[in-house]
Regions:
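Conserved active-site segment of CheY-like receiver
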Residues: 9, 79-84, 103
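Acidic phosphotransfer microenvironment of two-component signaling modules
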Residues: 11, 33-37, 107
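Two-component/phosphorelay signaling modules centered on CheY-like receiver
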Residues: 11-30
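Acidic, metal-coordinating helix/loop segments flanking the phosphotransfer/catalytic sites
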Residues: 18, 31-49
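Negatively charged, flexible loop motifs adjacent to catalytic sites
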Residues: 34, 57, 82-86
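Conserved phosphotransfer microenvironments
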Residues: 49-72
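Alpha4 helix (beta4-alpha4-beta5 surface) of REC/receiver domains from two-component response regulators
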Residues: 63, 81-99
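C-terminal output helix
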Residues: 87, 104-111
């Protein structure tokens, strides 16, 4: 069964993201509330997809994204405010991190 990691400090965002991940076939996404917690999960489990809802309480999240790309085979998506997404998308995409600006539609997320 494919595994997904959702890194987000917000309960509402967690529920929303988990719902969409279930629709994509990730039946029990693993949740992490911080970058540190996510790194511990990444060190002990294999994930197919890692979703980072920036900012996180202990870091912005772009560092976690680049770390995850270099340490795993997972696809990594960073969710951030649209204005910030425009500023960081090119740099992060060089590393292989997909950046999606918030707000976004369910259809955009599932793409």
């Amino acid at each position: 069964m494919p595994k997904a990691l959702i890194v987000s400090a917000g309960n509402n965002a967690n529920e929303y993201l988990a719902k969409h991940m279930v629709e994509l076939g990730y039946t029990r996404p693993v949740m992490a509330a911080s970058g540190g917690e996510a790194r511990r999960q990444i060190d002990t489990k294999d994930f197919e997809v890692i979703i980072i809802n920036a900012p996180l309480p202990d870091e912005f999240g772009h560092e976690l994204g680049t770390d995850a790309v270099t340490k795993t085979d997972a696809g990594v998506i960073l969710l951030t405010k649209a204005a910030t997404a425009d500023q960081i998308a090119d740099k992060l995409q060089e590393f292989g991190v997909l950046v999606l600006g918030k707000p976004f539609t369910g259809a955009q997320f599932r793409q």
